[in-house]
A protein has these predicted regions:
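Conserved N-proximal alpha/beta basic substrate-recognition cap immediately N-terminal to
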Residues: 10-122
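Phosphate-binding site of ATP-dependent enzymes
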Residues: 150-237
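Protein kinase-like catalytic core scaffold
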Residues: 136, 199, 242, 255-258
Length: 301
């Protein structure tokens, strides 16, 4: 029987640089990494179910996009104690309506109307959209990368059409948040959380380019709430690694505009302009190692 410290499932080609960094970090600390990809998925699944392979910690970055990985995820849920983003919690975090209901209780979120799925309720009662302003955003409960999202919506007819695109999903109608300007930048941030550490970044919502918030900027603009809010979201969602988007309005409110993103895009900025700053990705691998090391089995040395 082979025992690994960490099992990582991944299927996105652009994860390769992150996986390389993680693998090098594991090797430097004497830790073993089992990578399960589409190429070795069948063989690995058989080896796991036959108890030829076991692992201490499980990290899934594939099953959200490829259902073929679900058997490995299910096995890990039943047999592995330690997870980076436990699947049950990740599934809840993927549901934007569920996250809105949890987060909006204690933190600022955009004014939001939630709708049942089209399959559940094809005909909607009369909805007053005036509270959302002149235009609003229509979002399905699941999905990322803008799939199914309608920006600058203005009419109920757009809502009725949009909710039929993904008829099994609930929908959110959200008022637009206009960020304040801080110096030369708009006060819109994407903040990454990993195992207790928070990485605040300026976020250009048009170009999707990250810029790490410097300590001087954080102090000068009083941005400490980005850390406390993100840590509070981590407590509510229970995930080890995720990102969130927060905007500061002209009246100084910190508003969570995109609740929980998982799995997060970990492309290196040196390889892709809209990737994550390299130093953050490298630090994330070190944070993950700190989770793995206490569960390392000495017999592997």
């Amino acid at each position: 029987m082979e025992t690994y410290d960490l099992c990582l499932t991944w299927n996105w080609e652009y994860d390769a640089d992150f996986v390389k960094l993680l693998n090098l970090a594991c090797q430097s600390h004497g830790l073993s990494l089992l990578q399960i990809t589409p190429e070795n998925l069948l063989h690995s699944t058989q080896s796991i179910t036959n108890k030829e392979i076991v692992f201490q910690i499980f990290f899934d970055r594939a099953s959200d996009a490829d259902a073929r990985f679900i058997p490995v995820v299910q096995w890990a849920c039943n047999h592995v104690i330690h997870h980076i983003n436990f699947h049950k919690l990740a599934c809840r975090a993927w549901d934007k309506v569920a996250m809105h209901q949890v987060i909006s209780v204690s933190m600022n979120t955009p004014l939001t109307i939630t709708l049942p799925s089209y399959d559940e309720q094809p005909q909607l009662p009369e909805i007053d959209l005036s509270s959302l302003g002149e235009s609003f955003t229509i979002k399905p409960a699941y999905g990322g990368g803008g799939d199914g999202v309608v920006n600058e919506a203005t009419t109920l007819s757009q809502v009725l059409v949009a909710r039929q695109e993904f008829p099994t999903q609930r929908y959110l109608l959200q008022a637009h948040i206009i960020p304040a300007r801080l110096g030369a930048r708009m006060a819109w941030f994407r903040v990454i959380y990993c195992a207790g550490k928070v990485y605040p970044c300026w976020w250009d919502s048009d170009t999707h380019i990250y810029t790490h918030v410097t300590p001087n900027e954080e102090a000068y603009y009083s941005l400490g709430s980005l850390r406390t809010i993100t840590s509070s979201i981590a407590t509510l969602c229970g995930l080890t690694l995720f990102s969130t988007e927060i905007a500061i309005t002209s009246d100084g409110r910190f508003v969570i505009v995109d609740y929980v993103n998982d799995p997060i895009d970990l492309r290196l900025q040196s390889k892709a302009l809209d990737g994550v700053p390299d130093e953050i990705v490298k630090d994330i691998t070190e944070r993950l190692l700190e989770l793995i090391l206490p569960h390392h089995t000495p017999s592997q040395d």
